[in-house]
Amino acid sequence: MSAKTDEILDSLKSLSLLEASELVKQIEEAFGVSAAASAGVVMAAPGAAAGGDGADAAEEKTEFEVVLESFEASSKIKVLKEVRNATGLGLGEAKALVEAAPKTIKEGATKEDAEALKKAIEAVGGKVTLK
């Protein structure tokens, strides 16, 4: 990397969470982009690539889709926290995702990660399927 990009990276590493959030908002406004939309596109890409190998995927699946099917109303906040932890989404995006169940919450996950996420969400009252 160049000295300039190294310097920028070092500056970003020193930002507090609040400063990083403000920076994201400023970048979204300045460039007319949305961080949430690009995260969704990035998350969708591995799943799309896995779907292209129909014959290989039938033999042994290596990437999984974690789908939140439903949740107990009394456990909504706990499920929301688990979804946020797994996806890195903000509160608003995670809330919209949970309320839109059934909805894919993670794509391209390894078998171990998918099963761990399923177990964590089911432990707090959610119903999850792996595809």
Swiss-Prot record:
InterPro entries: Ribosomal_bL12, Ribosomal_bL12_C, Ribosomal_bL12_C/ClpS-like, Ribosomal_bL12_oligo, Ribosomal_bL12_oligo_N_sf. GO terms for molecular function: mRNA binding; structural constituent of ribosome. GO terms for cellular component: cytosolic large ribosomal subunit. The keyword Ribosomal protein applies. Homodimer. Part of the ribosomal stalk of the 50S ribosomal subunit. Forms a multimeric L10(L12)X complex, where L10 forms an elongated spine to which 2 to 4 L12 dimers bind in a sequential fashion. Binds GTP-bound translation factors. This is Large ribosomal subunit protein bL12. The lineage of its organism: Bacteria, Bacillati, Cyanobacteriota, Cyanophyceae, Synechococcales. SUPFAM superfamilies: ClpS-like (SSF54736), Ribosomal protein L7/12, oligomerisation (N-terminal) domain (SSF48300). Pfam families: Ribosomal_L12, Ribosomal_L12_N. Forms part of the ribosomal stalk which helps the ribosome interact with GTP-bound translation factors. Is thus essential for accurate translation. Keywords: Ribonucleoprotein, Ribosomal protein.
